[in-house]
Every structure is written in structure tokens, then in C-alpha cells.
């Protein structure tokens, strides 16, 4: 008769009639498969640290402002974003904060989990997928079709597909006279310093936590992540209300997509749960303040985030169950966490 294997103390009080050797073999097999599957999400170094793959980006361009002003609405450049992508969210935020809707059209691509690509519904320029659109624009066959991407439909041509460059381009994009400058010359050094801290430790840091291949790699990532958040909290306390002082800048734009997804995705799925955000009161107020800026709430879709992260990242959520979550606006506006 098979030996009865008792479940752990954290599971319901049940037993299962599975021989221990089968359980051990299943764990070993799953561990091996998990490592292979995680490799599909992103590479890791020999120590198990997640390393973001190099992007296939094209140098960004800004069309002639006079040319843009003379175009019909359907011939304006189009910014294509995905609701769940935090890198695309940066460009969307600049579009909203600077009121670029009169000179730049916005398209939202949808994640197709089965095909593993971005889909365009309805199709645009005769293309129903972002890959087909990249190919139509003459992108090298080896390039991944990623969001965000800025496309000029008159040729058609890709004007840029790297978020770090595109936020700079969109900050110089023709707009109405009172559109804010998110990177004024006197704050360039401060913006750059924040970028140097936040990109590896927070923006990539949450992925380094979630995609770590072992406990030591996770421990390193989560320590760096919360140390960086402590620095943000301290800076906001001393010289807020924004990261660079009295005005919102690209430094705020780059941080916001990560922190607005915190309770919905990164804490529960990526293990970024050492401390809840409400324990950073200045950072909590900062997030609430930015969320309340005109047009920002429109760019935030918690349901899409949960659906795409929990539904697509099979190695992190093999059951495929997409959890419900708190109302985003209620959570952001609250000073009390339910965690």
C-alpha cells in the first residue's frame, strides 16, 4: 500500500495517497521545467539574477512641426501603447500630461496570450498585429515588435520604439502653449540622477524580484528595491512634492507606472511585499497626487494589468487564476492599506 503523505502545516488538514518518491520526483521535474520556462521570460546570469534583454530599438525622430500642423487628423503620427506595459505607460503619461491629443493619435494594442504578441483591434494600416505593422514599416526581421512604438502613417515609418527616448521626444512634441516642460534645463541633472537610481533598482528591480532564479538573487533584488524606495521617501520629505522639487518631471513619469501597479501586480505576483506602500507616507501621497493629474487616470487599467500579468506569466502563476483586486481609485485615494 502506498505510504500516506501528509500535507504541510499551511495547507488544509487533508492527506493524499501519493508515495513520497513521486512527490520528490514531481518537484524536481517541475523545478527543472520552471528554470527552462523562466528562461523564456528573460535571461539570468550565473548567480540567478534577472538581466533584462537588450531592446531592439530604432533611433527616435521628431517630425517637422509645420508638417504635423498641416496634416489631416488621420495622417498624424500614432503612438501605440499596451495597457499592461509599464514602459509604454511612460509615453502615455507624457501624452496625457502635455495634452498631445491634437497632434498625436493614440492606439491601444491588446495582449494575445496564446500567440504571445500584441494585436491591433481594429486593424490599422491593414495590419491586425503589431508584428505585421513593424514589418510593413520596414523594421529588420530580427526585431521584436514591442510597445511603445511611434509610427508615421504617411510613409509608413517607425519614428521610435524605445520608451527612454520616446518620453524625451514627446516632451518636445508640438503642443498647445501651456503644455508643461517635463525636462527643463535646470532640472536635467536631477532627472538623470533619479534615472540612474530608479531604473535598475525599482523599474527593473520589481522584475529582478519576480524573475529571480533563486532565493539569494531575490534577496539581493528586494533589498535594493526597498533601499531605493527609502531614498525616494526621504527626498520627498525634504524637497517634495515631486521628485525634482516643485514641478512634475520625467523622473516622476518614469517611476509612476511601477508604483501604480504595486498592489495589483508587483506585491502579490513578483514578491515585492517586504513593506506595503502605505508605510512610505510621502511616496503614498506622491502617487495619489500624480494619479489625480488630468488624463492620468485614463491611462490606468488595473483589470488589464491583472489579466495580462497573472494570465500570461505562466511560470509565476501556472494555475492561470486571475485574482480580483481592490478598486484602483479607492486604493490610491486611501491612506489605509488592507494588506
Pin down the residues of each PLM region.
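C-terminal alpha-helical interaction module
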Residues: 1-339
